[in-house]
Structure formats: structure tokens, C-alpha cells
Regions:
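Gram-negative outer-membrane beta-barrel transporters
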Residues: 1-102, 108-117
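Active-site rim elements
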Residues: 12-17, 72-81, 89, 95-97, ...
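Hydrophobic, lipid-facing positions within transmembrane beta-strands of outer-membrane proteins
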Residues: 24-28, 86-92, 192-198, 274-280
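Secretory-pathway/luminal and periplasmic proteins that interact with or process carbohydrate-rich
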Residues: 49-52, 115-123, 221-228
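Flexible, surface-exposed loop regions and adjacent strand-edge segments
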Residues: 56-67, 123-132, 229-239
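Extracytoplasmic gating/loop element in the C-terminal half of outer-membrane beta-barrel translocons
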Residues: 107-208, 213, 238-264
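Short conserved catalytic/interaction loops centered on acidic-Pro-aromatic/His motifs
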Residues: 206-212, 223-234
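C-terminal beta-signal and terminal closure region of outer-membrane beta-barrel proteins
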Residues: 226-284
């Protein structure tokens, strides 16, 4: 049925909760401690997380509006944007014996975290709202077959060739021709990160174990050693592959002309940089 909308409101959206989402993780860990103060551990985690809407916006309307979908009113259960299929963690921690007549003690730790990059969706950068959902940039990409690709209208043959090369080289697209891409279909490249922790304990009241602890933490320590290490990548949740450059209408039939967007995944300039922090803690 059709209901009239009070003109005091921009949009009236009826949303409801869903219980379709779920996640699971499987982990294995090895640990070993040595009497001279060395502690080692290594773990591997495999898992997946699924959702129909990750709810990453501040209000329900934005969560509905910006959700990547073929039909915004009927989103499908797909990978969550927070899905991390594989993660490896290694911890190395050494605590020295007390020295300087029991006054000092040093602690050194390294933490390695390796994991798949963030998930992202393949989308179309539309020049207008063609599917009528009120937003121009949330439509998932249709992956044409070779025959369909040959029949599509492109701004140039170069754009057609580049789009075809993208489909055949993308790990997801080449196996899903003739289908719409799923939300969060693609996984970013493997990311490696090493963090360094150093602490110096100063025992100023030995009988009670009271101490002053000075700390130095270097986050993404590998990037401090080499600017090419510790890089993380992001695409702002989506990769816009195609855009509609124009639409011709003849006899009531709309025919779009497509252009290739030359999409790229770029390093995240903030999280890829090393950070350093110092601290002081007094216990008594």
C-alpha cells in the first residue's frame, strides 16, 4: 500500500531488527615459560563473521542508507566488514633478574600480529540514484560475463578492456561472472605489525615491593626500522570500479554508458605509521 508522508519529515523509514547474523572463531595456542625470565607464546585464529548490516553509522537512517546492497530494502546475509578470516599472533617477553642491589629490573616485550586486511565491497559510482534507494554510491557492482561485457556501452574501448582485465585478475570477480558482487566480498592484502614494549622497574621500598615503573612503547615498531614495513591498507569500505558517465533515453528505454574508474587500494597513512608513547606508574 501507499502511504502519504507528513511534509515535515524528509524521509520516513520503517526498520526492524534481524537475527540472521552470526560469527565463529577457532583458536590454537602454544605457550612456554623459562626459569630465566623468558616467556613465549604463539597462536592462530580462524573464523568468519556474517551480518546483513554492520550498523556502523550514528543513526538507523544512515545505517540503512549507506549499506552496500543490490536492494537496500532487502539486504542479504554476507561477510561482515569486521570479518578477519586468519590471524597469527606471537608474543616474546623477557623479564630480567633484579640488579643494582635489587633496585632495578628490566622488561622487554615484542608482539607480532599478522592478519588479513580489511574487507571491502565492489561498487558502482553512480552519477544519480538509479535504483531509487535515496543514495548514489551504495550499489553493488554487477560482474558481467564475457558476452555481456562485449554488449555493454562504454565511454571508450580502452575502458571496456580495463574493466575486463580487472574482472579476470580480481580473486573474487573471476569466479562470480554473471552475478552481483556480495557486500564485503573482497579481503585486503596480508598485514604485518610488530609492537615493542620496554619497562624499567625501580624498587624504592623493597620490603613492600613498591616501585616506580618507566615505560616506552613503540607501536608498529617495524615501520620505525623500515618505512615499507608495517603498512596497512584501506579503501573506505568500498572500491568503486565503474561509473555511469551518462544515460541516453530513447522510446522510454534508458541505456547507460559506463566508464572505468581505475580503482586502487591505498596505504592508510595514519595506522601505517609508527607511534611512540612513554609512561610512568607508581605502585605502593
Amino acid at each position: 500500500p501507499y502511504y502519504s508522508v507528513d511534509n515535515r519529515f524528509y524521509s520516513v523509514i520503517n526498520t526492524k531488527n534481524s537475527n540472521d547474523g552470526y560469527s565463529y572463531q577457532l583458536s590454537a595456542q602454544l605457550q612456554k615459560s623459562f626459569a630465566f625470565g623468558l616467556d613465549l607464546s604463539a597462536s592462530y585464529t580462524f573464523g568468519h563473521s556474517y551480518s546483513v548490516n554492520d550498523g556502523t553509522s550514528s543513526v538507523a537512517y544512515s545505517c540503512w542508507k549507506y549499506n552496500y546492497a543490490v536492494d537496500t530494502n532487502n539486504p542479504k546475509l554476507t561477510y561482515s566488514g569486521f570479518d578477519i578470516p586468519n590471524r597469527v599472533m606471537v608474543n616474546v617477553n623477557y623479564t630480567s633478574p633484579k640488579y643494582a642491589n635489587g633496585l632495578l629490573q628490566s622488561v622487554l616485550g615484542l608482539v607480532y600480529n599478522g592478519q588479513n586486511g580489511m574487507r571491502y565491497s565492489l561498487t558502482m559510482n553512480e552519477s544519480k540514484d538509479y535504483n531509487g534507494d535515496g543514495y548514489r554510491g551504495n550499489s553493488l557492482l554487477y560482474i558481467p560475463t564475457d558476452e555481456e561485457l562485449a554488449q555493454m556501452n562504454f565511454a571508450s574501448e580502452e575502458a571496456r578492456a580495463k574493466f575486463g582485465d580487472f574482472i579476470n585478475s580480481d580473486k573474487y570477480c573471476k569466479f562470480h561472472k554473471g552475478q552481483y558482487a556480495e557486500r564485503n566480498s573482497n579481503v585486503g592484502e596480508w598485514e604485518n605489525r610488530v609492537d615493542l614494549h620496554f619497562a624499567e622497574n625501580i624498587f624504592y621500598w623493597k620490603k613492600r615491593g613498591s616501585k616506580i615503573q618507566l615505560t616506552l612503547d613503540v607501536l608498529n615498531f617495524a615501520n620505525l626500522l623500515n618505512k615499507k614495513w608495517g603498512t596497512t591498507y584501506g579503501s573506505l569500505y568500498n572500491l568503486s570500479v565503474l561509473k555511469v558517465s551518462k544515460v541516453a533515453v530513447a522510446n522510454g528505454v534508458a541505456t547507460p554508458t559506463f566508464d572505468y574508474n581505475n580503482p586502487s587500494i591505498y596505504p592508510n597513512n595514519i595506522s601505517s605509521r609508527w607511534h611512540m608513547q612513554v609512561g610512568c606508574k607508581i605502585t605502593f
